[in-house]
Amino acid sequence: MKGSTLREGTAMASPLPQDMEEELAPVGSEPGDPRAKPPVKPKPRGLPSKPALPAKPSLLVPVGPRPPRGPLAELPSARKMNMLAGPQPYGVSKRPLPFAPRPSAEATAGGDVTQESGKEDAGKEDLPPLTPPARCAALGGVRKAPAPFRPSSERFAACTVEEILAKMEQPRKEILASPDRLWGSRLTFNHDGSSRYGPRTYGAPCPREEDSKSPAKGRSQEGTAEIPAECQEEHSKTPEERNLTSSPAMNGDLAKLACSEAPTDVSKTWVTSSADPVSEHGGSTSAVRLANISVPASESPRLSSRPSSPCHSQLSETQSPAASEASSICLPVTPASPSAVLPAEPPGHSPSSELPAEAAPETLSPNSSPVETVSGHHSPEQPPVLLPQLLTEGAELPDITRTFPCGEEAAARGHTESRPSSLAQRRFSEGVLQPPSQDQEKLGGSLATLPQGQGSQSALDRPFGSGTESNWSLSQSFEWTFPTRPSGLGVWRLDSPPPSPITEASEAAEAAEADSWAVSGRGEGVSQVGPGTPPAPESPRKPISGVQGNDPGISLPQRDDGESQPRSPALLPSTVEGPPGAPLLQAKENYEDQEPLVGHESPITLAAREAALPVLEPALGQQQPTPSDQPCILFVDVPDPEQALSTEEDVVTLGWAETTLPMTEAQEPCSVSPEPTGPESSSRWLDDLLASPPPNSGSARRAAGAELKDRQSPSTCSEGLLGWAQKDLQSEFGVATDSHHSSFGSSSWSQDTSQNYSLGGRSPVGDTGLGKRDWSSKCGQGSGEGSTREWASRHSLGQEVIGIGGSQDESEVPVRERAVGRPAQLGAQGLEADAQQWEFGKRESQDPHSIHDKELQDQEFGKRDSLGSFSTRDASLQDWEFGKRASVSTNQDTDENDQELGMKNLSRGYSSQDAEEQDREFEKRDSVLDIHGSRATAQQNQEFGKSAWFQDYSSGGGGSRVLGSQERGFGIRSLSSGFSPEEAQQQDEEFEKKTPVGEDRFCEASRDVGHLEEGASGGLLSPSTPHSRDGAARPKDEGSWQDGDSSQEITRLQGRMQAESQSPTNVDLEDKEREQRGWAGEFSLGVAAQSEAAFSPGRQDWSRDVCVEASESSYQFGIIGNDRVSGAGLSPSRKSGGGHFVPPGETKAGAVDWTDQLGLRNLEVSSCVSSEGPSEARENVVGQMGWSDSLGLNNGDLARRLGTGESEEPRSLGVGEKDWTSSVEARNRDLPGQAEVGRHSQARESGVGEPDWSGAEAGEFLKSRERGVGQADWTPDLGLRNMAPGAGCSPGEPRELGVGQVDWGDDLGLRNLEVSCDLESGGSRGCGVGQMDWAQDLGLRNLRLCGAPSEVRECGVGRVGPDLELDPKSSGSLSPGLETEDPLEARELGVGEISGPETQGEDSSSPSFETPSEDTGMDTGEAPSLGASPSSCLTRSPPSGSQSLLEGIMTASSSKGAPQRESAASGSRVLLEEEGLAAGAGQGEPQEPSRAPLPSSRPQPDGEASQVEEVDGTWSLTGAARQNEQASAPPPRRPPRGLLPSCPSEDFSFIEDTEILDSAMYRSRANLGRKRGHRAPAIRPGGTLGLSETADSDTRLFQDSTEPRASRVPSSDEEVVEEPQSRRTRMSLGTKGLKVNLFPGLSPSALKAKLRSRNRSAEEGEVTESKSSQKESSVQRSKSCKVPGLGKPLTLPPKPEKSSGSEGSSPNWLQALKLKKKKI
């Protein structure tokens, strides 16, 4: 049996421990070699075959000295496995503290003393005792569990190991104290495959205890006499030494096992006299244990008897439930009386012989620890005993019984496994053994109890403390993560104490507080039970006899205190110094009292172990391995009727519960069990948690409780490594969410629900902080339910939604939770609740209902549909968006989130700060975003969610394509939705787990936001809703909120998707959507209702809040999507608010920061995708506002264009677009507070978040972000523009907004923008596009396009009418139709997408558009590449520069189209800026000016594209001025617009030109190497102009390259000027490429000479000369720019040089530089 194996291993391990001890202390593997060799030879044979040892070489290295332990050599594989699994870190966590001193002392004098005492004890004990003493010595000194570790080492080789042992002995000695070694021992033992999985570990402690105790009776009496001195001595030395010295007999075989498994030391401590556990656990515990051993020398036998009795009782229990019962009953009978030990001793009848004792204990071991036996955890009969104990111990005891069942099972497992993961398993085992510990205490309250309960639990708990234990789990997670640290139990015990104390001091105190709270809240009954039971003065802890096993609450505070105390030398010395008798007994009792907490902590290790067990495959095996484990299960079932079925879970769960015991043992058992068990249990334990959260609300609970919960989640999730690491991450990093994410959808939902709860928590706002934390922790822990509930409970929300809806929802319908809990909680949140409230009045009822009704809404999807159709759905969306944001915000700025403004602030602060924090804090973001991402990603998680999902959408797989094929949109969204709610969530959870990285989180966040925004904007909901449309079944999850949401949201989505899809239905849908979108907007923006209700004012504010929040939350997790979406929406929302846009700017600023990063990225992608399909992009990008904007611009722009072109049809088509374009307008108008607000709301509905943000600002946002314009900067710029023009000309404003879209729509779809501008009213879209700045520019462009719409629209948009309709479109009604139409066209154009053709059918000018689409496609193909990059480049421009940058970006984005647009934008911008809204008025006029500038601008833009890359505000401004100057030439402007048709010929000529192609390449390179960004302008101007002047090159870097170029190199520049601007552009592009100093090595004179010769040749051959001049300019510039490291860009110049056939030296230089650059 595993018991036999363990016994064998223990016997073998016993020699090994001795050897280890000797080898460790004396270096001699000789003492252990003879004994160890026989076992080592066989075991290593088996173990060498095990690859586990190699798996953990770090451990093995320390184990090197121990290889003589053949038997344990086998154990190390499992131990190593467990070590790898990661539960051990927690087991190690506790032990390291006790071991920390122990290894040191032992290393110094303790080693010898320990050896001596161990050997002496061993001598007393004969071989088995000797082996245990050796082990004890290893334990006492090594209790580091290096003995097992040596077998680990030995695993590598048996004979070789001996040799290695000789080599590694010394290291082993060192390693004795080394974490790896102790770790290895613990882990080794834990990974005692059979021990951990089977009763081996279990029995090992018990038998060892018996063995130890049999010898301990004889030897413990002797040895106790010795040990009292030795123990005190060793106590002062080290807990390990004390353990070794204190309880050689007790430690005996157990010591072997303890040595084998330092983690088991706790269990060992259980079985071993208190001295063992105490010494093992730390000074205090050791003192107590030593007190038990040394002070109660006479009690030592009793302790021996008692441990023997429990052990044997366990054995008997395993063997006979009656004996078990008797023993168990005896234990209860004598909670603290030693006499009970004697009665228990007969059942235990510890084998007289050490081997029998060892065998029996091992046999017992399979069952559980003696304490476990005490728990009666094995026998059904025992449960009554435990139940009496439970009754005695009070309410907490039943939970403990519950815990004990699991705990005992876990204790059996835990002892089996806990030996390795001494801390966690011990904790768990002791948690299980806590009642037995009581019983043992009852059995005499002798050392056995202390070793088991006090020593193990209190020591374990103390080493880790309630909070500390979490910390220790964390630390040891790290230890586990970093085997070096966990290598040695003893060493890390020493090392661990500092890490552990980090948590211990603070967390132990906090844990003490939290535990005190938990004791008050959870352990109240326990305290009641305990106080009467305690025999010792320390009643709270003393209740150990009555409550010890069941006194997690009491034990917790005291344990924390005890932990702090045992950890603190003061306590330890006092215990050591104090009389070994009463003080030690008292301490022992205290520790016994603490012991339950240790047991609770132990379950954590069990949970961790279980998490590791899955890794090792023993989690189930743990329970399964032995009948005794099953009896444990049986007992668990019996004592824990509630959780009888949860036994397995309970083992894990109880481990978690006990681990979370700091929270509430009574709760935690439920929490533990229910979490694995399911919603019911979850609700129950959540209720418990709700009762207990306040105590653990503190950081201790957060750290420990959260960690514990994390442990629960890993336990539940069987995350194993990750789970524990997650726990650690959560407590330390707060990243635990991920772990539990993958654990189970419910857990995910718990997380989500936690978010929902967090939202709800946000409702209680004040609690949000806690909710956030707890939510993060719990969510992270995957105990969103308990977490949330607890959190809700903690948070005065009482979160009925959480408790009722949330818990039920979480249990019942995660989706509902998500949808409702979230919306409910959202509703609960004043902000969204109010918005939703007054949005629907259901929201009002929902607000009152918020929690209740939301839950009901959650429950009542119909209600959600009816009331929360949008309300719930809105709430859901808001919950998603807003709640997500709020939740994210809650996570970040919980308290702020608590307030609407707090939410706003949260959004803002969160967005700017916390968004980045979240971005930075992947954990939180991961928690929130992952949760959200899990949720939204789940929805979006076709691939990774928004990433895949967005790209699906944004790639045209989403948005337009999805939109274009709304079916496909639905399909995709259905996919998304189907995916999203359930599949996707789970997938996403997995993805999040797998892809929880910030990237994925960003993706998920982005996608989440995008999804949310899309859903909110219709994208997410759209997919969700289409999914709902496709099947409302999915709406269940998504449709939960989508269900009701789905209809309206679908409607809205439809409207939006149709708007996106631009199908006429969208008109109806738009109307619907306007209805819906009011709430949809609220929903989407989390502001629709509010926005709708208070569209201009309230909504704007609320929208601002929500938008900001959504935006920021979006940033937070939507990042790009939300950033764009909400960002834009925020701006508009804020714009709606008037000055709000600035906060959005703020928000955007923060959001832009990372959105800049992310958004930039997405923007480029977005922009490309968005260009591809505005609808699609919009749909896609609904969440991805940036390019949704772009889209929005395309859509909005185009929508406006289309709206202009085909007001009606496009409106139908563009309803959503128009809507959200209108929305943009409406937003902008919303800002004005026009009826457009309704439309805005509808637009928001459509694009709820999208219109708001997407309308223009999202694009601007993204664009700005992309450009780094400081989105806030130029988004406010945009906002201001939008705001000013918005107020003045709401269409223009939306255009402004659209300009943001157009802006990077310019980048992205500058053509679209251009088309948009042209199509749009110049001002409206111009403003919007030009971001007002170049939105005006664009407005001019729009005017330009508007003026030349026939031309442009003919050429580009081919739509004069629509363009003219732009004015009406400005009105927003007609515009959107045109816009919609146009957007497709623009999108077509912008992306070169065939949307134009789609639009074609819709728009009469679509063919023109198509041409532009092609041209623009080419143009945009280049421009977006360039543009997207340039926009990214522009990202750095300031707001004012942003306008210029926008111009530049437009130019850069459109490269060619951008020049047109930028020329137009410059002129238009000036005009529009001057006119503000003169877009419509100046349409015709600006068009022409735009045209004129456009060609000029075009060359510039190429140049400027580089400049844009340079992102020089002056350059941009110069470009703008230049463009403005050039704005007078209408024809060129038209070509730019015509650029698609006519200019494209020119532009494409160059593009087609080799140089142009090269330029494109160079541009790409330039974009890639933006390092040259600032250089690019210099190259452009300097390239042509600065050829002659090096200094001038730098100066001209930011000057117009065109004019200076001409003046600088008259011939070549003139030629260049004379050359088609396309050529110049080509040059510019080439220059762009050349802007890198082509010839850094070339001297200015040489370059000039070459240049002159080239110029001459250029005069002869202008083309060559121009190229040469470009090269020369690059070369000359290289002179100047050479220093900045522009040499790298030389790669680009070489090609032009080659192409221009520059002189040999130049090519040589170029080639050399090329090579250099390439090499670089």
Swiss-Prot record:
Motif (Nuclear localization signal): 1620-1626, 1714-1719
Keywords, comma-separated and alphabetical: ADP-ribosylation, Chromosome, Cytoplasm, Cytoskeleton, Methylation, Nucleus, Phosphoprotein
Protein origin, superkingdom: Eukaryota
Positions where Phosphoserine occurs in the chain: 14, 178, 220, 286, 300, 429, 437, 496, 500, 539, 568, 602, 673, 692, 713, 763, 796, 807, 845, 866, 871, 876, 887, 912, 976, 980, 1006, 1017, 1022, 1047, 1063, 1084, 1096, 1126, 1131, 1171, 1212, 1241, 1246, 1290, 1321, 1324, 1373, 1375, 1425, 1429, 1437, 1440, 1442, 1463, 1466, 1496, 1549, 1611-1612, 1622, 1643, 1657, 1706
Biased composition (Low complexity): 296-316, 502-518, 742-758, 1477-1489, 1671-1690
Places the protein is found: Nucleus; Cytoplasm, Cytoskeleton; Chromosome
Post-translational note: ADP-ribosylated by TNKS1.
Modified residues (N6-methyllysine): K1635
Keyword Nucleotide-binding: no
UniProt-listed GO biological process terms: cellular response to ionizing radiation; double-strand break repair
Coiled-coil intervals: none
InterPro entries named in the record: Tankyrase-bd_C, TNKS1BP1-like
Summary of subunit composition and partner proteins: Binds to the ANK repeat domain of TNKS1 and TNKS2.
Record's protein name: 182 kDa tankyrase-1-binding protein
Source organism: Mus musculus
Organism phylogeny: Eukaryota, Metazoa, Chordata, Craniata, Vertebrata
